[in-house]
Amino acid sequence: MTGKRTQIIPAQTSHLDAVTALEALTFPEDAISKRSFRRFIESSTADFHVLVADARVIGYTVVLYRNNTNLARLYALVVDEGFRSRGYGRSLLQTAEE
């Protein structure tokens, strides 16, 4: 991942507006709702991380886990169009795999 001021951190409720806006831009006809993103933050069976660059959310991942199994599903992986082809998606995926 390139960039000196980028970090991948667990999503917080303060990120919801930015994530919801990015989701709507990326998937205008099938966007995940703000309510669902809030549930992912609160859920013990979800990992929701955001990629932040200079205090701006530029990407995120959501991984959902099935109860009582070793199964996980990458539910969402988004990088802002203006930040693609810089390794950010790869970094988000690596974090999701951890």
Language model features: what each stretch is:
Residues 3-6, 10-84, 90-95:
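Acetyl-CoA-dependent GNAT
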